[in-house]
């Protein structure tokens, strides 16, 4: 089985449907006897350029290990789902389980807010 990293951009008005969509994608991966190494919800973020007259999107990251024939089904599912604005599926050499830099930066910002400056 191969390791893949998938980034999804989901329509920002449908963030409440995100858990249902992710569950559907998880069932597809598990149906192929694949494993999910990492799921990260990056939240709503500004797009670099507008896509379909949208300026924001809900970002989601998945690191999975599946047979190569599952990728075609995932790709078709993403392509025909109206709520998925963009997707990218990248083959990676090994599984990635640590927190991504995108989430680390969010945690760093939260840590900075909690700090108290004493002078």
Swiss-Prot record:
It comes from the Bacteria. GO terms for cellular component: cytosolic small ribosomal subunit. GO terms for biological process: translation. Gene3D superfamilies: 3.30.70.60. One of its GO terms (molecular function) is structural constituent of ribosome. Signal peptide: none annotated. SUPFAM superfamilies: Ribosomal protein S6. HAMAP family: Ribosomal_bS6. Binds together with bS18 to 16S ribosomal RNA. PANTHER family: MITOCHONDRIAL 28S RIBOSOMAL PROTEIN S6, SMALL RIBOSOMAL SUBUNIT PROTEIN BS6M. This is Small ribosomal subunit protein bS6. It comes from Buchnera aphidicola subsp. Baizongia pistaciae (strain Bp). The gene is rpsF.
